[in-house]
């Protein structure tokens, strides 16, 4: 199989762009996609994002997290540099941890219409408590909906050792 052609990547404008602008306000419109060349099979794509930051909506203090995004694509896939810039746009966004994870998941669902997706944020402790919100989605009426239910029921069954991340 040959590699991707330039015409296959016409919607990918940020990758390789040396004039990238970093946005400091929540910006879902920065997300870009490219075609999934393997729509006939299920496979996971996982992003490990260890430098996520946002702001507490009440105090304005910074929150830090590692975010894990896993999805099974259908026709479209998110381009990683656009995802990086999108996550960076949360830097001055004030929202609770749980809201940030759900917003990210909802934006990616709207962008790609994946078969399945999960987003898990592992936030560093503040005030002696770490918060690890997890959300997922499986396309309704499909095996992926059942998969989402199963993964939710079995999520995080075993306590972990928290070592201040």
Swiss-Prot record:
Its family remark reads: Belongs to the GTP cyclohydrolase I family. QueF type 1 subfamily.
Q: Which PANTHER family match?
A: NADPH-DEPENDENT 7-CYANO-7-DEAZAGUANINE REDUCTASE
Species for this entry = Bacillus cytotoxicus (strain DSM 22905 / CIP 110041 / 391-98 / NVH 391-98)
Reported EC number(s) for this entry are: 1.7.1.13
EC category name = oxidoreductase
Q: Name one GO molecular function term.
A: preQ1 synthase activity
InterPro entries reported for this sequence = GTP-CH-I_C/QueF (IPR043133), NADPH_dep_7-cyano-7-deazaG_red (IPR050084), QueF (IPR029500), QueF_type1 (IPR016856)
**Compartment list:** Cytoplasm
**Which Pfam families does the entry mention?**
QueF
Name the residues annotated as catalytic in the UniProt entry. Answer: 56 (thioimide intermediate), 63 (proton donor)
From the UniProt record, report the name of the gene that encodes this protein.
Answer: queF
Any one of the GO CC terms: cytoplasm
Q: Where does substrate bind?
A: 78-80, 97-98
Q: Name one GO biological process term.
A: queuosine biosynthetic process
Chief location bin? cytoplasm
What is the protein's name according to its record? NADPH-dependent 7-cyano-7-deazaguanine reductase
Q: Which reaction does it catalyse?
A: 7-aminomethyl-7-carbaguanine + 2 NADP(+) = 7-cyano-7-deazaguanine + 2 NADPH + 3 H(+)
Which N-terminal residues, if any, form the signal peptide?
A: none
**Is Transmembrane tagged as a keyword?**
no
* HAMAP family listed in its UniProt record: QueF_type1
Task: Provide this UniProt record's keywords sorted from A to Z.
Answer: Cytoplasm, NADP, Oxidoreductase, Queuosine biosynthesis
Q: In which pathway does it act?
A: tRNA modification; tRNA-queuosine biosynthesis
| Function as written in the Swiss-Prot or TrEMBL entry | Catalyzes the NADPH-dependent reduction of 7-cyano-7-deazaguanine (preQ0) to 7-aminomethyl-7-deazaguanine (preQ1).
Q: Does the keyword Oxidoreductase apply?
A: yes
């Amino acid at each position: 199989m040959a590699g991707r052609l330039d015409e296959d990547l016409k919607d990918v404008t940020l990758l390789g762009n040396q004039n990238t602008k970093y946005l400091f306000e929540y910006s879902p419109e920065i997300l870009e996609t490219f075609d999934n060349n393997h729509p006939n099979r299920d496979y996971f794509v996982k992003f490990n994002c260890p430098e996520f930051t946002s702001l507490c909506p009440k105090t304005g203090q910074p929150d830090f997290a590692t975010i894990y995004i896993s999805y099974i694509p259908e026709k479209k896939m998110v381009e990683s540099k656009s995802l990086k810039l999108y996550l960076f746009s949360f830097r001055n966004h004030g929202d609770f941890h749980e809201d940030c994870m759900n917003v990210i998941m909802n934006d990616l669902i709207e962008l790609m219409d994946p078969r399945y997706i999960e987003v898990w944020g592992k936030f560093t402790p503040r005030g002696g408590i770490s918060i690890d919100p997890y959300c997922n989605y499986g396309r309704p009426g499909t095996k992926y909906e059942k998969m989402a239910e199963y993964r939710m029921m079995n999520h995080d069954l075993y306590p972990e050792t928290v070592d201040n991340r």
